[in-house]
């Protein structure tokens, strides 16, 4: 009985990461958060939609973004047998769930991630994961609270995968270099499309110095086109570099290029190309206050990844001219935006953000009242409660 006492004491408490310890003996943890937001669109679009947004689509109204629940067991590369095994389950409920999951459980609830893990005793440990996992591609991710800003960049929201389903292997060659590669047959993204054909994703992480870190990523394989029978190979390659300027300030620069065969009805060769670059400046005034800035340019040369939404739920990636049943016309465009975010975190369990964003296009894809325009200014208050 005495040997069981320490484990019982720890259960029900939280670890250094704030996770609830469900079972110390089994190494199982529980965590999650609730998020809600309100966005004021100064264009006051008559359809109540923020154009070309993915998750923050509701104009001039409150949005119950997500209730996120996570249950996981971490695999220990230094352990033996059962210690090397792990699992991860992440369930979402709320309006942000539409594009995140891959099981189509319901429009407002789905599993974002569910995978099993085992670290093989090869070298420093060959980490194998199988199931649905957040994609390797991109600096930003699905967890809003882990991104510098509340709203997502177009680089992420329009042009990158959200989650993938398949098998992934990761290996740490040294303290400076690690590599991951995955064979996948399903992808979730803002277009909601998927395929059962094999694709490959990869990421190389290089820690150059304590302050400088670089990540290079890639994706290749067949993807659906805009019309039936127009499937073609997609190639996406790029990366991001982060640099710690001072103890309180850091910056990130991301860029990538993507091309898909037979996906565009606007380009002469039929191929769709999209690319972009984004820069971030992150500054923490103290433990409670911080400011974040983002600026990006995104080009959809083939008119393939932007303006694919309708005015029906989930109302994402919508452009002027869309209706309840159809998208707006295909348009090749160059987009750029600037976002500033003031962050206040009075306690570890509460994150609040006030964000101003200005969107601009070389085409009239945004909506001012009931007419088309080329710009869109918004102001958002976002609140996240961690448990």
Task: Annotate the PLM regions.
Residues 188-189, 224:
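Active-site environment of divalent metal-dependent phosphoester hydrolases
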Residues 15-17, 339:
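Short structured motifs
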């Amino acid at each position: 009985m005495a040997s069981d006492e320490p484990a019982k004491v720890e259960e029900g408490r939280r670890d250094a990461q704030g996770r609830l310890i469900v079972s110390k003996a089994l190494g199982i943890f529980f965590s999650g958060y609730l998020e809600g937001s309100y966005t004021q669109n100064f264009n006051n679009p008559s359809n109540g939609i923020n154009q070309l947004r993915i998750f923050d689509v509701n104009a001039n109204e409150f949005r119950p973004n997500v209730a996120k629940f996570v249950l996981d067991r971490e695999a220990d590369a230094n352990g033996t047998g059962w210690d090397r095994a792990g699992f991860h389950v992440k369930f979402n409920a709320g309006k942000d769930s539409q594009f995140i999951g891959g099981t189509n459980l319901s429009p407002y609830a789905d599993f974002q991630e569910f995978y099993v893990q085992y670290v093989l005793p090869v070298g420093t440990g060959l980490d194998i994961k199988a199931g649905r996992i957040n994609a390797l591609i991109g600096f930003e991710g699905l967890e809003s609270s882990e991104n510098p800003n509340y709203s997502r960049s177009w680089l992420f929201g329009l042009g990158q995968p959200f989650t993938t389903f398949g098998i992934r292997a990761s290996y740490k060659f040294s303290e400076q270099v690690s590599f991951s590669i995955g064979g996948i047959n399903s992808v979730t993204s803002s277009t909601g499309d998927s395929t059962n054909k094999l694709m490959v994703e990869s990421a190389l992480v290089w820690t150059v110095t304590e302050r400088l870190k670089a990540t290079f990523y890639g994706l290749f394989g067949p993807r659906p086109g805009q019309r039936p029978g127009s499937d073609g190979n997609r190639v996406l390659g790029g990366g991001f570099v982060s640099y710690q300027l001072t103890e309180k300030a850091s910056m990130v620069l991301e860029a990538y290029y993507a091309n898909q065969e037979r996906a565009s009805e606007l380009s002469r060769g039929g191929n769709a190309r999209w690319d972009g670059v984004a820069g971030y400046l992150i500054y923490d005034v103290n433990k409670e206050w911080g400011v974040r800035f983002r600026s990006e340019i995104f080009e959809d040369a083939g008119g393939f990844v932007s303006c694919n939404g309708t005015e029906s739920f989930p109302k994402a990636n919508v452009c002027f001219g869309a209706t309840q049943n159809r998208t707006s016309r295909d348009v090749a465009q160059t987009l750029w935006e600037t976002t500033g975010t003031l962050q206040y975190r009075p306690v570890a369990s509460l994150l609040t953000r006030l964000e101003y964003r200005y969107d601009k296009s070389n085409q009239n894809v945004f909506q001012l009242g009931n007419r088309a325009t080329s710009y869109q200014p918004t102001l958002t208050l976002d609140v996240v409660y961690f448990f």
